Amino acid sequence: MFRRVRPYSTFIDKCPPPAYDTGCTYCKVPAFPPDKRLDATTHLNGTAPSMWKHVLAFSHGVATFDTMPPKINLVPGSLASEFEVLRRKMLSPQHPVTLSNAIVSGIDGGTHQKVFIYPDCIQVEFKLANLPEFIQHYLLPVQETESVFNPFASANATPHTKVERPHLFQETPIHKDLVLICGHTQRDIRCGRIAPLLLQEFERVLAHEKLDVDVGLVSHIGGHAYAGNVIYFSKHQPPVWYGRVFPEQVQGIVRETIVEGRIIKELYRGQTM
């Protein structure tokens, strides 16, 4: 199917109804515990967290989000665990970076560490021992934003500016768009129960529409009360974040946002970058 490549300049108010039933389009969403009800009233626009870059890790060693710990840095020896140790010391506070674990069929973890970086839209493979150099090369700005003078700051603080070391990394462009659904069961049951239904529906709709788009699950990304949370990573545009997505809205997202490049207002949590 032909897809338009254009800026997200067009909005539509409502998600259109599905045109066909894949077999799971009208699947009933499982009930939630009384203390885990969905927020059906808060205006979604502006609820997406702001980030400068989003790193998706595939080399975490966890097969399903049903077994992934509630905090991804609790996986011993993982990229997330090592990243947590370094982030406060090395990252720029003016350029926030989010690291998430992702599971996508057809994308393996590689022999070392494999990550996707957005909005750069690149795949990078590297050795875990080179994580500090990875942060310096990919996750720091060329020039730091001037901050307010802090008389208590250490004179020997690590500079938060880019240092290039390309020989340590295998970098390739990302060639396919990606849809990720929050499915972090042990972090919050709401996303854990909705995600399998959304994953199945996206897979069926994308196949029906003959669209070559990857789809998978991602760890906690914020706003479980707005489940299902869906992020669409386009090769050409900033990521788009939707909330309160249910199976019957998947066809509308595919048709309006992925194919036509339009944003659906009632589901829109914001652009994350």
UniProtKB/Swiss-Prot annotation:
Domain of life: Eukaryota
CDD domains per UniProt: TRX_Fd_Sucrase
InterPro entries linked to this entry: Aim32/Apd1-like, Thioredoxin-like_sf
UniProt cross-references to SUPFAM superfamilies, sorted A to Z: Thioredoxin-like
Pfam families attached to this UniProt entry: Suc_Fer-like
Family, similarity comment: Belongs to the AIM32 family.
Protein name as it appears in the record: Altered inheritance of mitochondria protein 32
Organism encoding this protein: Clavispora lusitaniae (strain ATCC 42720)
